[in-house]
Amino acid sequence: MKIFVTGGTGFIGSHLVEALLEQGHEVRTLVRSKLKWLAGRPVVPVKGDLDNIEALREGMRGADLVYHLAALVKAPKQETLNYANVEGSENLLRTAQKAGVPKIVMLSSLAAAGPSFSRPLTEEDPLMPISMYGVSKKLMEEMVHRTATGSDSITLLRPPAVYGPREEQILSFFQIAGRGICPIVGGNADARISMVHVDDVVQGLLLAGTKREQGVHTYFVSSEDVYTWNQIKTATGEALQRRLFTLPLPPKLVQLAGSTIERAGGLFGAYPDLNRDKAREMTHQWTCSVEKIKRELKYRQTRSLQDGIRHTIRWYQKHNWL
């Protein structure tokens, strides 16, 4: 098949593109500057961004399938995130409709649904985001439902926190663990979270590409189990082959750190990864159910927590990130 991918040079996107190439597909990817992880791979680069309708047309010409993974994950203003994640996605969707692309898969996020409380969230729960990024993804999903026609086949996937080789944000957790400390965000080691290895997100994306029924279909894609911080600590310690000491980080401390770091970054014109918005997200429980994607797309988790963390840490060590 001819497949067009946005966000193909990023963390999840580069793994998806590699999987598509291994399956023998012709892959074009939207590129703003460098191919990064895809350098040397037999991909067809299409220079441009989501504002460049002509580039989108070029990428989708004759395409059998479009994967939309490009997104802005942080910005100091809601309108900046909305412009990238909602308006940019609408440009892509409308261009795909005009090009007659038979299947579109778009990456959303658990952040669009919001945190969980008494049980893992399902696709039937109302969307209640608590971060600016989550709001932008919620608005993106709502735009898709408004814009989709009766003949469209669109799948929205919502992963939680994604880890694996090439990931640069959760990396900081493993770097701290490499010094013998396991930070427990929120302070409760028994708090439960969903997280997923990038290989399983790619599996979900590939399966979603095969679902050709008309309509908009939404799925969480995650680990089949939810984990506690204690389980994450144990798996990380085993992979690092060292004992980890717990460092509880109460919500107020995390929020203070996010606020302080954001203000400090502002002095230098930077918006840091840890900011007030991110701190607000980090202090909640985030769990989701994968029963729907298991039932309808036959999804099965392929990497356990222990195997996934071990695989990730080995890659970080091999590339001198740890």
Residues of each region from the PLM?
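Flexible, glycine-rich beta-alpha linker
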Residues: 114, 152-171
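Conserved Rossmann-fold NAD(P)-dependent oxidoreductase catalytic core, especially the SDR/UDP-sugar
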Residues: 87-133, 155
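Active-site Tyr-X1-5-Lys
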Residues: 130-155
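N-terminal Rossmann NAD(P)H-binding glycine-rich loop of SDR-like oxidoreductase domains
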Residues: 3-23
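Mid/C-terminal beta-alpha module of Rossmann-like enzyme folds, strongest
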Residues: 207-273, 290, 310-311
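NAD(P)H-binding glycine-rich loop region in Rossmannoid oxidoreductase-like domains
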Residues: 39, 47-87, 95, 110-115
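Amphipathic terminal alpha-helices
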Residues: 291-295, 304-322
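Substrate-positioning beta->alpha
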Residues: 139, 167-172, 187-209, 216-220
